[in-house]
Regions:
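Conserved short histidine dyad/triad with adjacent acidic residue
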Residues: 35-51, 172-188
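Short acidic-glycine-tyrosine-enriched beta hairpin
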Residues: 10, 71-86, 208-224
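Ligand-binding loop in jelly-roll beta-barrel domains
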Residues: 30, 86-113, 167, 223-248
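Histidine-centered metal-chelating micro-motifs
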Residues: 45, 66, 80-82, 86-92, ...
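Glycine- and acidic-residue-biased ligand/ion/polar-headgroup-sensing regions
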Residues: 53-65, 190-202, 207
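A short, N-terminal "cap"/entry segment at the start of jelly-roll beta-barrel domains
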Residues: 1-33, 41, 117-170
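Fold-core signature of tandem repeat domains
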Residues: 37, 58, 103-105, 174, ...
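A cytosolic small-molecule/anion-sensing beta-strand core signal
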Residues: 61-62, 77-78, 198-199, 214-215, ...
């Protein structure tokens, strides 16, 4: 999926590059890739493995996933985020009884989307992933439950919760209402800023246009792309910065 470096992206629920009945690619860039995955109760995910050069992250939208985190195992219900730093052994599956839907984020992409294309076609493809026979090592994935995280509560209708802060990727959940003025049009030179609307509607300012986006919409602003947003009612979204580029630190200072 080739993108003009200066053009923002807006994809509504179900839109994107569909690889099969489960996987829809939302963004593929060197800095980050995002795909939305919808699996049934019989889904068996990858066994224990690690990545040397990128962060592998997840946000559970519906259902639950079971994660291997080092030698530990945990259940991640809807609203849980997981960010796995390089060299941490991890794996995941759907424990059932129902289906699950989640976002999978790789920062940088490290050829993950190209790997998926080959895997769907039944072809081998070498990328930054290394299988291990048994889980080992520390449980150092950053796991944050639905009501957890570093909450930055503002007096004007905004709560910004830091879910993960690493050099390569930071994750936030913003909850707000129309009392908050939102964010004026701006751009970043050093990272990709993207959003997934979890609930409600938001007016996004993308380039010279304003678009109303609802639940399940994904928006990405590559470096140089002008973007901003205006709340119109209670809403929440996942905000993703890749790389972090100091954004989490600046959020604390606001």
């Amino acid at each position: 999926m080739e993108l003009d470096v200066a053009q923002p992206v807006l994809l509504r629920h179900g839109e994107g590059e569909r690889l099969n009945e489960r996987i829809v690619v939302k963004l593929e860039r060197p800095e980050i890739s995002v795909n939305e995955v919808d699996v049934g109760p019989d889904f068996v995910g990858p066994g224990p493995h690690f990545h040397k050069n990128h962060v592998d992250a997840f946000y559970v939208l519906e259902g639950q996933l079971e994660f291997t985190n080092g030698t530990e195992t945990l259940l991640a219900p809807a609203g849980t985020s997981v960010a796995v730093p390089p060299n941490i052994v991890h794996g995941f599956t759907n424990p059932g009884p129902g289906g699950a839907r989640y976002l999978n984020i790789h920062a940088p992409d490290a050829d993950f989307i190209e790997y998926l294309r080959h895997a769907v076609a039944g072809e081998e493809f070498s990328w930054d992933s290394y299988d291990v026979d048994e889980p080992y090592g520390p449980a150092e994935a950053i796991v944050v439950g639905p009501d957890d995280g570093e909450r930055l509560v503002r007096p004007f209708g905004l709560t910004n919760t830091i879910r993960a802060e690493t050099t390569l990727l930071s994750l936030f959940v913003l909850e707000f209402d129309e009392r908050w003025e939102g964010v004026d049009p701006h751009h970043h030179d050093d990272h990709v800023d993207s959003f997934f609307i979890l609930d409600g509607e938001v007016d996004f300012l993308l380039g010279d246009e304003t678009t109303r986006a609802g639940t399940g919409t994904y928006v990405a602003a590559p470096p140089g792309a002008t973007h901003g947003f205006r709340p119109i009612a209670p809403a929440s979204f996942l905000n993703i910065h890749a790389p972090d580029a100091g954004f989490a630190g600046r959020a604390r200072g606001r």
